[in-house]
């Protein structure tokens, strides 16, 4: 049975951890879905790990839709969420409705994710959810604000910053978000947020007290040339693939592949 947004909330109530990962193509999405991942996010992180951009900022709505269509063809069980990229929702609720509507209509995804929880974004979330578009929030370190942050530092360390993030979490929950991504914040702040909101919190670099965890699949598979300190590679595919290609190349050059026909 396919995972739903309501099911995630039920799992929070039961204390059942939520497993989430990113995917950007058909093959990886199929593997994740078959492995029983609960939530698959087509993140705008694809700009950095798949398209080669330095940040997520250049990613377009068309690029998100293109990759999300491929993922949708593979996913049968997991809940599929797609990021709204930079400047496709910040201008107005109407812009957000148009962008989110395109994603749901053209890709078949069940929900969208957007960053920040300030007053304007909370109102946008309220508008989206009021017309039936499920929204996942994302607070703490929000990559679309990389230049404002001056990089990717941990957020919420100062008391005023911690209070602001908590306020954003409460506002997004009140606005109707079905879940929150908490990125790169202190574990005690993530714990406080998790205890105070009725919707699931999905941590990425936010400690062990969240209702679930998410990582970029390239980091999990050891494909990234750099990964954040909170990521954990479970295999080193970067090395494995490089070695496999070198062996293939050597066999071709020595005419060992393909094998000549037997006499």
From Swiss-Prot:
Binding-site positions, 3-methyl-2-oxobutanoate: 44-45, 83, 113
UniProt function note: Catalyzes the reversible reaction in which hydroxymethyl group from 5,10-methylenetetrahydrofolate is transferred onto alpha-ketoisovalerate to form ketopantoate.
Co-factor(s): Mg(2+)
Protein name as catalogued: 3-methyl-2-oxobutanoate hydroxymethyltransferase
Binding-site positions, Mg(2+): 44, 83, 115
Keywords for the protein's UniProt record, in alphabetical order: Cytoplasm, Magnesium, Metal-binding, Pantothenate biosynthesis, Transferase
Cofactor note: Binds 1 Mg(2+) ion per subunit.
Subcellular location(s) of the protein: Cytoplasm
Species of the source: Trichodesmium erythraeum (strain IMS101)
Organism domain of life: Bacteria
Record EC number: 2.1.2.11
Quaternary assembly: Homodecamer; pentamer of dimers.
Pathway(s) per entry: Cofactor biosynthesis; (R)-pantothenate biosynthesis; (R)-pantoate from 3-methyl-2-oxobutanoate: step 1/2
């Amino acid at each position: 049975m396919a995972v739903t947004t309501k099911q995630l909330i039920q799992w929070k109530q039961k204390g059942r951890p939520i497993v989430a990962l990113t995917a950007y193509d058909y093959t990886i999405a199929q593997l994740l879905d078959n492995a029983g991942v609960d939530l698959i996010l087509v993140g705008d992180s694809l700009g950095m790990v798949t398209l080669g951009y330095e940040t997520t900022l250049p990613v377009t709505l068309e690029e998100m839709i293109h990759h999300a269509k491929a993922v949708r063809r593979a996913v049968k069980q997991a809940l599929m969420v797609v990021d709204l990229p930079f400047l496709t929702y910040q201008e107005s609720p109407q812009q957000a409705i148009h962008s989110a509507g395109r994603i749901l209509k053209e890709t078949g995804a069940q929900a969208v994710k957007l960053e920040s929880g300030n007053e304007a974004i909370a109102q946008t979330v309220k508008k989206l959810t009021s017309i039936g578009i499920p929204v996942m929030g994302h607070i703490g370190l929000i990559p679309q604000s990389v230049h404002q942050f001056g990089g990717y530092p941990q957020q919420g360390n100062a008391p005023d910053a911690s209070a602001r993030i908590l306020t954003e979490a409460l506002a997004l929950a009140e606005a109707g978000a079905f879940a929150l991504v908490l990125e790169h914040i202190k574990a005690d702040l993530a714990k406080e947020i998790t205890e105070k909101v009725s919707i699931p919190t999905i941590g990425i670099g936010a400690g062990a007290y969240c209702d679930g965890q998410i990582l970029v699949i390239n980091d999990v598979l050891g494909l990234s040339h750099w990964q954040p300190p909170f990521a954990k590679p479970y295999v080193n595919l970067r090395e494995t693939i490089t070695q496999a290609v070198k062996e293939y190349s050597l066999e071709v050059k020595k005419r060992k592949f393909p094998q000549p026909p037997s006499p």
